[in-house]
Amino acid sequence: MVKLIYILWAPKGQPSQTTRELLLNKIQPRLYDAGVKKLTIYIDDEFSNVRSSAPKLYSGPEISAELSLWVDNVERHLEIEIILQSGLFTYAGYVVEESIYTEYGGNKHFHKRDWPDGQRSPVLMAITLMERPQKLSREEWIKRWHGTQSPVSEAMQPRARYIRNVVLQALTPDAPPFEGIVEEAWPSVKHYTNPFLFYGAGKMNVFKLAANMYRMLRSVSAFLELNKIRSSTMSEYILKS
């Protein structure tokens, strides 16, 4: 099977609750009719409206949702896009190669998944869209992301799940030039908004916090331009696993 990711922007001014209901109640069943075999939707809704402890330098429009889906043939994207158009979404589609670095229950920070398909996951999601700096070859960029940043962040941060998606191909005209899409689950809002938890600095250890922030900044800036990192908090709905 092939994994596709669609980044969605809802019509300007549309309430997040309307976006969620449209995606879950109307778009979801039609996607199965279009041949989608597995589906997770990440939605910027009222349950995920929080600020990160990480600095945010990008000031462009926030994304409304991400569709993460599996199909048996990439040509299915044409049917999928007709469905998205019916919801009046602006969208960008990509073929990706997924690698799960940490699964639910894969570390001490969270338990194995024990909730059913269709129920909102008891975590806070962070979806990050990444562009490769032109000064780095694609090979070197992936090496720094997978070989350095992933283990550095895993050792430091209390994530529940970490999925890396390397973009293989853009499906839609004028799609932003993202080459990586990260799906991170955090055990709670507090783990994402409290800098001491977010950076693995323990209980109010300001020296460890400063050291870890510096280490993270060096690791991230070695493969990304900070002002181009787009990160959004979302709710996760695993709909068909």
Which residues are covered by each model-predicted region?
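Macromolecular interaction modules
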Residues: 1-241
